Amino acid sequence: MAKTKQIIVIGSVVALVAVLLAQPIKGLVNKEKQTAAASESKPSNEVNLENISSMTKQGLDASLVKEISDIEGQVAKASGEDKIKLLQQLANKWDDVAKPAPQAFIYEEMAKVSPKFEYWLKAGNAYRAAYTNLQDSTLAQALNQNAIHAYEAALKANTSSLDAKTGLGAAMVSGTNNPMAGIALLREVVAADPKNLEANKTLGLFSLQSRQFDKAIERFKTVIDQKPDAESYFYLATGYENIGMKKEAVTAFQKSKELAADPSLSQFIDRKIAELSK
């Protein structure tokens, strides 16, 4: 299952970069059009666990769908700690097939039963994973607002959490009319913890999106120093490519290919290297 999830993540990297470069963050590139008011974080009532679960089950193996449905039936009759245990089983089932959207609603439900910081944080992280690179813009916006709500609840439970602040900052950049407020939160995290992996990675992605490639390169160098994975090398290579540093781009793309061991990504990288080597 872990290998399957890795391929799904790596396979989405190319598409994400294309989206990032095609849709600059409002307020970062076109600052004159930025509005100062941020959207309120209101969870959507129209998007819920029941319809997300039903939608996500489509295309899954019939036996797995039955397992999930059976647990859902038990959850409906349970309460307290018994309900928490069943919800965790349900979250694990969705995690096995890399489906963060239903996971997010499940963790939020766990937080409502037992309002713990860890449940709100997991809900926020899963919502964020679910809306990232999602083609359905209406659903993505709803999940984004849910992420903001979950991270805000997590921060209320633990005001010093850099993980919650990082998640909230990232969600605010992509889900409100005041992206600079989200960037400010991320910078607060980096000021407190200069090597913070997730904050640097998130700022690096937003630097790519706002076409600040020099800044993106520095962010991903910091990330790679701690966690040299295929995804980060791919983003680093993209930064180098866009400022004309072809040799460095080729080297980074090659490292991404080696670490990913994913045929579809390897083919794409081979084409990129051929173009850059001309």
Where are these regions (language model features)?
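Short coil turns that delineate tetratricopeptide repeat
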Residues: 81, 114-115, 159, 194, ...
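Canonical positions in the second alpha-helix
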Residues: 110, 153-154, 188-189, 222-223, ...
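Terminal, low-structured helical/coil segments at or just beyond the last alpha-helical repeat
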Residues: 2-13, 214, 218, 227-230, ...
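Residue at a conserved register position within TPR or TPR-like alpha-solenoid repeats
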Residues: 94, 107, 126-127, 172, ...
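N-terminal leader/linker segments that initiate helical-solenoid repeat arrays
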Residues: 2-101
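Structural signature of tandem alpha-helical TPR/SEL1-like repeats
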Residues: 64, 68, 98-105, 134, ...
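TPR alpha-solenoid repeat register
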Residues: 86, 119-120, 164, 199, ...
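Canonical tetratricopeptide repeat
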Residues: 89, 122, 126, 167-168, ...
